[in-house]
Amino acid sequence: AAKNSFDAQLTAFELISEAALELVLKNIPDSQRPTAISPWYVLAEFSHVGAAPIENWLATRIECGEVADGVIAQSAAQAKQLWALRENISEAQKVEGVSIKHDVAVPVSRIPEFLARADAALLNAFPGIRVVAFGHVGDGNLHYNLSQPDAQKNTAFIASQPEVNRIVHDTVHALNGSISAEHGIG
């Protein structure tokens, strides 16, 4: 809906999971939750668009139930704070221990299906695994990182990497996607 409404004026469209945001809030000092708790958040950036069209677009999305809540940065400083939440995800994840990281791409329309299928398969195979998903969904790219279950040691989690990778890669390929998407490999 954002791309249809704003076309080239939509310069960023980042998906952030609650798990990713929680890591930032927990591990990065001075981070603040920008809005009510939700399973997913989108950080969108617009160029050369006044506030009114964005406010109207957001109000329409909320009215029709596509969006639960929203925040529009009122200053450059507030925009910087919002972007810091996205930019600090990887750093926040490091504090929690070892991660198994993936950079995948699937057709934009299939991102929800990828998340549902991969999450379910991984949680079935590795109860307690923590999925930290975020990324540039405007072009189908997604950082799909897995953190160890809270009680598991790094070495045990690292040993599961081949099976974790197989599950993620099989799901990506089943949806006509690719791995190492952002970096041009695969």
Residue ranges and their predicted role:
Residues 1-186:
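Noncatalytic alpha-helical scaffold of FAD-dependent oxidoreductases
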